[in-house]
Amino acid sequence: MLIKIGNLIYTLVLIPHVLTYLLKRHLFRYEVERWGEVLRLSVSPRNDVRLFLTLVRDIREFRTLFYYRLGPRYFLLRWLAPGMPTCFLHGSERQNVGRGLVIHHGHSMRLGAKHVGEDVEIWHNVTVGKKQSGGELPTIGNRVKICTGAVVLGDIHIGDDATIGACAVVLKDVPANSVVAGNPARIIRHNGQPCNVAL
């Protein structure tokens, strides 16, 4: 009984989030549907508000992305239901992160890039940023997957449909349709064919 009352109170706290979503639905609908597909939740055009409520209630990484997209003016929402405290999305321009970004287990995740393409997936303990103080940031293409513990640093370009393997250290450009792994990272698959090529 107490758990049901607690869930009801928490859902009521999220009413401002739902109202914000309804006002800015055109900005977030794709994001909500994408998270629903990736997490294998029920997705249909008629249940996007219910799906949004599920995501914003249960998934702190989604809340972090939602707040990032809204910007600092919506700090009250952040106060009512905090996002993931160790998941950092950097960039003063909200447009530098393409739509459809999905963050899996956002613990100790730091994303700072010139541009992040659409439908990118990132796992926990990932660092994307500058190689050195004052250095340049990476550019991430579309449909890129950056797996657990990977490090992507410097003025480099990660091509479309690339996968950065777990714990890979990437300091050079990664071609499109490639899988890289290791430290230093090497291409282990390109265009679906196994290989072993230095970056």
Predicted segments, located by residue:
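Terminal amphipathic alpha-helical/low-complexity segments used for targeting or macromolecular assembly
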Residues: 1-86, 195-199
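Short, flexible segments with low predicted structural confidence
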Residues: 48-54, 68-69, 73-75, 91-93, ...
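Aromatic-residue detector
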Residues: 70, 85-88, 106, 112, ...
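Right-handed parallel beta-helix
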Residues: 78-100
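Left-handed beta-helix
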Residues: 92-94, 98-100, 104-107, 112-113, ...
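Short, basic/aromatic-enriched C-terminal tail that caps enzymatic domains
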Residues: 183-199
